[in-house]
Structures are given as C-alpha cells and as structure tokens.
Amino acid sequence: MRNYMTGLLLGHLDTDFEEMNELYSSLGIIHLFALSGMQVGFFMDAFKKLLLRLGLTQEKLKWLTYPFSLIYAGLTGFSASVIRSLLQKLLAQHGIKGLDNFALTVLVLFIIMPNFFLTAGGVLSCAYAFILTMTSKEGEGLKAVARESLVISLGILPILSFYFAEFQPWSILLTFVFSFLFDVVFLPLLSILFILSFIYPVTQFNFVFEWLENIIRLVSQLASRPLVLGQPTTWLLILLLVSLALVYDFRKNVKRLAGFSLFIVGLFFLIKHPLENEITMLDVGQGESIFLRDVTGKTILIDVGGKAEFDKKIQAWQEKATTSNAQRTLIPYLKSRGVDKIDQLILTNTDKEHVGDLLEVTKAFHVGEILV
C-alpha cells in the first residue's frame, strides 16, 4: 500500500516496486502513476469543496488555489505534467477554456520551463492534453468516455513509437478500466489513509492492493507482448501527425477517412519493415554485438554482450538496482528498428562479455533458435 500511496499522491515509486513497475509498463498503464490531470483535478476539487464547506466565497477561494497549487507542485518535485495540469486548472478559473487554455498553457511553459519539450514526459503530457481538448466536446456518458480512451490511445501512437518504439493494444481497455478505478476508488481511499497515518497507521486495507496486484499479474500472463512498431524518423513522425490531423478533419467522410487510415498503416509498415538489407555493429559494453537483417525481414544477432562479474563481498545495504548493457543499448536499438523476433541468435563464446545478457534478450524478443 505504501508504494501506491507515494506513487499516486506524490509521484514517487520506490525500488521495491520494481516487479510491479515492469508489469504495469508491459501492460501500457504505468502512466497512471505519472502525476497529471487526474491527481491535480482530484486534489483541486477536494480543496475547493473543503473551503466552500468552511464558508469561503468563490472569489476568495479562487485566489487561495494559487498557494495551494504552488505547495502541491513543490511536493511533487515540480513535475512537468503537474505544472501543465495546474496551469490549465488555474486558467480555467478565469474563464479561459478549450484551445485558448491549451495555447496559453504552452506559452507559459515555454517561459517558466524552457526545457519542457526536451523530455518525453513533457511532450506526452501536452499531447494528451491537446487530444483531450480536441475531443472533450464530442458526446457524454460511458460511450463517449470509451471512445475518448480509444481516440487518445490511437492519437498518441506516433509519439509513443518515437520515444518507446512499442505499443500495448491492451492498454486501450486497461487504461479505461484502471483510470476509472484509480480516480474513483484509490485516490480518495489513499488520501484519507495518508491523513490518518499521522494519527494512527491503518494497514487493514493492504489486502485491497494485494488483490489488485494479483489481478495485474493475471492480466499480464494473459496479455500478449507489446507490439514493436519501430521508431519513426523525424520526417516520418511529422507525416504521421499531419495524417492523423487529416483523419480527424475527415472523420465524417468515410472514403477519405479510409484512405488516410490506410496511408497511416502503410507508414507504420515502412517503419517496422524498412525493406532494406542491414548490418549493424553495436557497442554493448565490454564487447560488440552484430545485427543482420535482409530485405525479407530475416534477422540474425551475433552475441548479446554482458558484464564480467567479480567476486566481491558486499553488505546488504550496499546492494543496488543495476541495469544490464542490453537493456541500455541492444534492446532499445533493436526495438527502434521494429524488431520483435530474432530468427537466429549466434553466441560465439561462453564468456560473460558475450552471453551475459542472454536472459534479458530472450525476455524482450521471440528467439527462433540459439546457435553456439
């Protein structure tokens, strides 16, 4: 329960949450722990309702939200997505809504946080906000929420592929279900428990989060691996975004909608299958890995790299989480090239420098055969 409390309320996930972090990431719903509009909206609304109950007028309340926003932003480490959400909330108080609200928010962000768009979190936060702004007026009710979840997931796809090169189709349904669950159940529950923890720690609700984690593990076993789409070049990314904008404009014209949709599918196909022969040598730490792919898509990988381990006694407190060379270089590169299967994995040596990261590679990709 502690990790969910710090994660959902303050945006901090400890290292002992690593297993669940990987499961949430593989299912494409780790963004639920990224502080954004859901948390900001919940806390701002709760703050307003509390002060209104105490008898404050709307005019006084409007100005009290500014110091509250500053304190909350500080507690979350001035997260880019939180700053964006708070700015939009504060501007909405003054009657600035819709695209005007979004445009002014981006302008202010450029002034106070010039490096905002240099981070994946900043770009994704603004992209989500823009799509929500464009689709928020189209219908109400459960059907509209489900359609909105689908539109957001598909609309953000080019940017997700640019930064992460993969997409989990299950995330569309899971985001719809778990965002509702987190917003309606867990945020209020954890907020109350957090306040009570200063008086008396309440641990009786641990079973709820154990139950949630068991469900996540079950869904992870049933769900397929994320789709590896590949990383588009800058020009292909721009072309994808323009095409998606045209799809939105022509959404009521079936023929044009179908035409642009097929064009987008074709672009994603070219990203994943470049239709060219490729030989790449990768620096994987203490050795090199060679990747080969022909025009038909057959792939061969020679060696996976690794780290030489030395027998050095360390105490428990000195142990730390480490990332393998393959997770830093080899796996991200292969995914950026649209690779989801390695037909032949050739290991030229049994030394750690050649085969040390074999387990990480076999977890990340389907491997046809291993040759030693």
Give the residues covered by each predicted segment.
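Histidine-/acidic- and/or cysteine-rich, low-complexity loops and terminal segments associated
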Residues: 1-18, 315-317
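Alpha-helical transmembrane segments of multi-pass integral membrane proteins
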Residues: 133-230
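Non-globular, low-confidence helical/coil segments that flank catalytic cores
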Residues: 18, 25, 144, 194, ...
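Hydrophobic alpha-helical transmembrane segments in multi-pass membrane proteins
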Residues: 20-174, 235-274
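Conserved residues at the C-terminal ends of beta-strands
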Residues: 11, 35, 345-348
